[in-house]
Amino acid sequence: MFDCEPVSLLITIPGQVPEPIAADFPWLSLSILFPIAGSLLVPFIPDEGEGKQVRWYALFIALTTFLITVGAYLKGFEPAEEGLQLSERVPWLPDLGLTWAVGADGLSMPLILLTSFITALAVLAAWPVSFKPKLFFFLILAMDGGQIAVFAVQDMLLFFLAWELELLPVYLLLAIWGGKKRQYAATKFIIYTAGSSLFILLAGLAMGFFGGGAPNFEFTHLANQQFGTGFQLLCYGGLLIAFGVKLPIVPLHTWLPDAHGEATAPVHMLLAGILLKMGGYALLRFNAQLLPAAHAQFAPLLIVLGVVNIIYAALTSFAQRNLKRKIAYSSISHMGFVLIGIGSFSTLGTSGAMLQMISHGLIGASLFFLVGATYDRTHTLQLNEMGGVGQKMRIMFALWTVCSLASLALPGMSGFVSELMVFAGLVTDEVYTLPFRIVIAGLAAIGVILTPIYLLSMLREIFFGQENVDLLAKRELVDAEPREIYIIGSLLVPIIGIGLYPRIMTETYTASIDGLVARDKLSIERVINTSSSEFSNQNISISNGQAPNLNIYSSSK
């Protein structure tokens, strides 16, 4: 069915991934299993009807999980190492080739820390939840372990299981605690995400059984396989669909505005802060690292899709009158920079994509938390019904302003650094021809210009628009409380810290990004050299395992 032999256009190269460094202590297994085990004990927590005990218990579990991940980083992770660290490998079902294999490198460690950090704050954001609190916090904690597993596991089948594990909690959190259209939003979410994840299973099985013999699904094994180019292209296309739904990539994005439109504040934080990053991480881990030959062909498409994300979502956000949907489309727009960075074949651009995921995780979580806090007071999401609330909520206005400035990439904040790195990486690296780079940079800049327009106009409408007399008369229209200030403050510390001193984060993953881009550039050089010398006047069929001639690549590379 697949071409399993290297073809004449051989751009399939061994991954040359360094050998994993074994863990002295099972940090990552503990960070995965501890919140899952903690969630299983939630039903046994004494409950007086208001869920006070279970709230404190969930916060304890989430904070402890965060401390475990911090311990893993401080005690067992060396940023200067390119390869896998904190590696644990235990045979699970050897006859099926399934191994409990976990580890972390520069691609995964920052996202593991982000996951545990955002989840702890989401538990604090869920403090007012009074409807079925035990079930709510059970799902939050189970989701915590599942999402950490997505970034930590190093086995394709384990990755698929972890990917599926976090779907059910999100579905239930939407379907039970969502808004009026919660059933529709939850069903749409599960259809999109569960349906597309079938491609992960198919690609994983195909790669694990490649070449005959005993199946092996571990990433280190797959990275050193010489997959045929046609095989890589088929796997890459399927995985791009699966991960494109999560990122999300336009036009696979329509589930996200509906999900955000019905979710509660803590679920917003998990969706924007963590869930979308799973798609970007998986594109780097699988598409770019395990399938370099196909990545050389698909990278220009990723860049074009990134530009479409940026412009389309920014324009759509500008037209939205619903506050949640406006911020949801803003998230889609910002994730377009991740696609451009991944497709740039530039160390600086790819590093910018990684930083953009971290930055957006923090900024997106802060904005959506503020959306939830504002809705709790106004009981409306329509911008034309919120006018003048700045008179009674001055601290809330200040928090909104700072977080919005972070989202529009104000210098001194993390979003500015990440977007600047993506632009600089694309423009300065000569992998692509100069006209292509200029056109892409110019189009992406349109989105950068639109962002402050729709965000600042949003602030004006909420806080200084035409006064809604009935709304202003409500006594529950109170200013930000200490818990809310603490949550936003906790998110702003890394946002501003990274913006002022980016190396505190970029040094965590620079070595891994350098190795990844070096292997991908070797692949693209073979595309350029071979296509220019042998295939410049031919139409090459992908079905024959050969790559098409792409004249957007610079011949100097």
Curated annotation (Swiss-Prot):
Source species: Prochlorococcus marinus (strain SARG / CCMP1375 / SS120)
Entry annotated with the keyword NAD: yes
A molecular function (GO) term: NADH dehydrogenase (ubiquinone) activity
Designated name of the protein: NAD(P)H-quinone oxidoreductase chain 4
Transmembrane parts of this sequence: 25-45, 57-77, 111-131, 133-153, 157-177, 189-209, 230-250, 264-284, 298-318, 327-347, 353-373, 397-417, 438-458, 485-505
Membrane among keywords: yes
Subcellular localization, as worded in the UniProt entry: Cellular thylakoid membrane
EC assignment: 7.1.1.-
